[in-house]
Amino acid sequence: MQKNFLSLALLGALALPALTAAAGPFSLDEAIRHTLNQNPELRAAGHQAQAADARADAAKGAFLPQIDVRYLARRSDNPLDAFADKLNTRSVTGADFDPARLNSPDTSTLHATQLSVELPLYTGGRRMAGVREAGAYAEAARLGYERHQQAAAYNALHAYRAAQAAAEAVIIANDAVEAAREHAETAARLVRQGRIVASDRMTAELNLAAAEGAREQAANRQRLAIEALRLVTGMPADAELVLPPWGAPDAVAALASAAESEQRALATRKDLKASEAFVRASRAKVTTARAAFQPQIGVIAADSWYDSNAALDNKSQSIMGVVSMNIFSGGRDWHGLTAAHHDTEQNELRLEGLQQAVRGEVRAATSRLTEASARRAIARQTADKARENVRLVKQRYGEGRTILIDLLMAERLLVEARNEELAAGLGQELSAAQLQLAEGSLSLPGDVPTR
């Protein structure tokens, strides 16, 4: 069933059509699904997992009898071959023992067909170790594929939210341009009325130009963010993407302690489990290497047919037991066993190093999320205060109790506060996803094929 599911996932990758704006807004789940189906590295990991499954099935075949058929056609005037052909075809006569005929036989033609069945009975544990090794490699490949899925899903989420935030930044920039244009028009009118000096009008015009320049920068960042989203999801370069508007993320719930998150990661991270599977595979390889020092016992049964033509005639049967043991192989077996031990130690140390790295990732992700949550709370309060400040300064400016530069400064602070609130919200959402990825708990869309 696992292989069937993975096959469906790979077939879906080839069949999934490119999404267009005609299908409606491009949702986050759609972006993740498209990434999982179109990402070349992920598809390669899926094929790697299928190949490992096939090798695991092949290893199990070592416990089944091996059946072979062999056909041979030969012409020879070799004395031994010629006499053996007569024996095998049961055509020996008394005249065939004449020394002259034995030493100088006529050319003999033989057609031989053999059907044999071979079954190893004891291999020193090599067959079972081979099954364990191949099974562990298959498990490691499957877990590696699932970890690739989570990493690809995070990359899609990152690109998607960044594109949404870039679109929201354009809205903020448009609002800033509209406010700056309003102030520039007001300043121009007041100059004509002689109520303010010309330098105030120029200040308002410079403020408008700065706002328009910032809007161009925001629009370019949005284009780059959409292009990055197309690249991550595997969308065509000319695909038109329509995203739903940015929605501020909810406040972060109470975080678990770093120790709890570390334990969760050590228990659930797919790459850690894959590394553990590599350790099991290398230990099985040690058992396989040790089998070279054990006797090999097997049984072979065969039916053979011999004739001067291709017909199946003159059948003979044989059955034999075989016991073999290598005495000297030039040190190959000893060196192979030593290498297997070193491979095991290497994989155990890599597992230990990965465990330490995972702990560090979880601690760093927890710290980033704590910082991002606090930063967003501050940014939200600051944005609210900046809006109220603009309202009050506008009121005072309309009453003639403050100067234009104060109003422009208040508007600029509001733009900065809104951009900071947006950046803090994006940082909080990405930090939360990074923590889930570090813990190995990042969820995928429900209909994504998994093994």
Describe the role of every protein-language-model region.
Residues G24, E41, G130, D200, ...:
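DHp/HisKA histidine-phosphotransfer helix
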Residues F26, R147-R264, A365-A372, L414-V415:
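Periplasmic alpha-helical coiled-coil/stalk elements that build and connect Gram-negative outer-membrane
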Residues A44-A59, H148, A152-A173, E182-A184, ...:
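Amphipathic alpha-helical coiled-coil segments
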Residues G61-L64, A152, V197, F293:
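Short, glycine-/polar-rich solvent-exposed loops and beta-turns at beta-strand/coil boundaries
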